[in-house]
Amino acid sequence: MAKQKIRIRLKAYDHRVIDQSAEKIVETAKRSGADVSGPIPLPTEKSVYTIIRAVHKYKDSREQFEQRTHKRLIDIVNPTPKTVDALMGLNLPSGVDIEIKL
């Protein structure tokens, strides 16, 4: 018989918020009796944008901005119905994107 697994991917711009959310999820799953592996840090995406500072000319004067997307992966093996109910009722902070695969 195949084991049932829930895979949760978290994405956020702030690493502190994503780590707090991951700890809440892991703590909730362990309290309900499921096996948890993670949080596993995935590679951080870095997007760099270059913008000309001046409005009309002075192309040599530029400014660069970057946006980092932090990601974490959590696997919950053999979840119980109690685990699923606890995860559905969990309040996580805004700014965290959650993808759940069964």
Swiss-Prot record:
The keyword tRNA-binding does not apply. GO terms for biological process: translation. SUPFAM superfamilies: Ribosomal protein S10 (SSF54999). GO terms for cellular component: ribonucleoprotein complex; ribosome. InterPro entries: Ribosomal_uS10, Ribosomal_uS10_CS, Ribosomal_uS10_dom, Ribosomal_uS10_dom_sf. Keywords: Ribonucleoprotein, Ribosomal protein. It comes from the Bacteria. The keyword Ribosomal protein applies. SMART domains: Ribosomal_S10. One of its GO terms (molecular function) is tRNA binding. Part of the 30S ribosomal subunit. NCBIfam families: PRK00596.1 (NF001861), rpsJ_bact (TIGR01049). Belongs to the universal ribosomal protein uS10 family. Involved in the binding of tRNA to the ribosomes. This is Small ribosomal subunit protein uS10. It comes from Staphylococcus aureus (strain JH9).
